Amino acid sequence: MKARIKIPGAMLDGVHRDLHRPHPFAFERVGFMTAGVAQAGADRLLLLARDYQPVADEDYLPDRGVGAKIGSDAMRKAAQLVYQGRSALLHIHSHGGIGRPEFSGIDLRSGAEFVPGFFHSVPRMPHGILVLSQDSATGLLWFGPDQSGDYVADFVRVGAPYRKFGERP
């Protein structure tokens, strides 16, 4: 299944600003994006970003072994977001830099641990993880709690300037 994620330009700009704010002890910021999901062909899904919620400062946990560690309160708040709106839930953070970013080993391991839990709130939607750079993105989507993640095919910034990025072969 190939998936495209469309994000309104103003929202994407706001996500970038939020993820680059300093935190008292975390090395990076984390947020959650919700998205509606539409079938866009026999083997293609379209995710339309709806909302972005930053993780509150008090929901970060000190851990010098990772860029950011968030607690169960952050996960609970995110689950409440999607439960009410029947949306896909996407955990999002930034690695900065230019070009298509890649997930770290920690990103991949932790995503494989926590993303299946999102299916308890909204079982019939895909859920996943995204990592941004300054001009691109990479995403993994899970289509069920017992499946592995599939890479997002591409991303589209909607609005002026319209831009496609993060394409995967």
Ranges and model annotations:
Residues 1-88, 96-169:
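Conserved beta-strand-loop surface patch within small alpha/beta domains used
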